[in-house]
Amino acid sequence: MIAKEDEELADMISGLVKKQFFYINIDPYANAFNEEANGAGHQTDHTKMNDWIWERKYEIDSLCYPIQLAYLLYKNTGKTDQFNPTFIEGIKKILGVFETEQDHEHSPYTFVRDTTRKEDTLINDGRGAKTTFTGMTWSGFRPSDDACRYGYLVPSNMFAVVVLGYVEEIFQTILDDKEIVQKAQILKKEIQEGIQNHGRTVNQKGQTIYAYEVDGMGNATVMDDSNVPNLIAAPYLGYCSEQEEDYLQTRRTLLSKENPYFYEGKYAKGIGSSHTPKEYVWPIALAMEGMTTPDKSEKERLLNLLVATDAGTHLMHEGFDVNNPENYTREWFSWANMMFCELVMDYFDIRVEK
């Protein structure tokens, strides 16, 4: 938003987009890179590493966020220099990976880490749990960097549907490439149909809700994780309305004990993660809860809760103990700090144009 008036900031964001697509072109399956080809990072992992790659846990959202940033920069400033040949090549690679991973059984991607922490590696010789075709695209890991239990991560597929719409618009109105437009349209349609036909389950009351993960063979997880994209964030991402009935039923379910990562204690209640201890809720999840409700008093309650549970640091943490906020992970967490600021803006009806 500030970039609308600040050309230097807009140029910086554009440079960031260009750097992200530079890395995507090195390997669209990697989730973290080195500043230079120095061989740092998890080089002992059993996957196709190179000196540029820090870690190669494949996560759908790693490919969605750069598209979102490129599009929102254009939408809010009119800037288009980020749509350069590197961007175009990166989009082709992203579309190729999304298509390949619709049929993961024939994918070249595998990942094994020598570790005692099961969330840091994929079962089945690095291929993950077995899946069958649904139209959705497979993900090895969640936004938390923890392994998926089932391969079709529904909120990340929701995010993919949204950004494929961005790709379609960019290549129709700014860049003229009918082949990319057609491929994006087909993928968007197939993934959306996959979510609607296979990405839902029922809660304990028998109500239809969105599952967090499915395998296409009848297995599904009823849960949500704090890291975004998650199911709570579906309206924030632009996938659906805050008032969609299936979303509301999903939301009510996930903000209850039916979600194994929902915790309630003396000082707070909210969603945590497999990535942090039990009874720890995440400020990111609390902020997202606030940004996906139309109730202004609820937004205010959550803002006050976040301020009251910062353990006197005046910063947001990764997670904190619902019974003792003095116990927390990460003294400061940039992502959570940003989400708190965005919730403040949201409360005052200041929002990025999407």
Briefly describe each language-model feature range.
Residues 178-218, 241-339, 346-354:
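Non-catalytic carbohydrate-binding regions of carbohydrate-active enzymes
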Residues 27-32, 96-116, 152, 162-245, ...:
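Catalytic cores of carbohydrate-active enzymes
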Residues 155:
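Active-site-adjacent mobile loop/cap segments within catalytic or ligand-binding domains
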Residues 1-119, 333-350:
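Aromatic-rich carbohydrate-recognition surfaces in CAZymes
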Residues 31-57, 107-149, 202-229, 263-287, ...:
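Carbohydrate-binding/catalytic loop surfaces
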Residues 7-24, 67, 71, 84-99, ...:
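Hydrophobic core segments within long, regular secondary-structure runs in both alpha-
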Residues 1-7, 65-80, 158-177, 232-243, ...:
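Well-ordered alpha-helical scaffold segments within catalytic/enzyme domains
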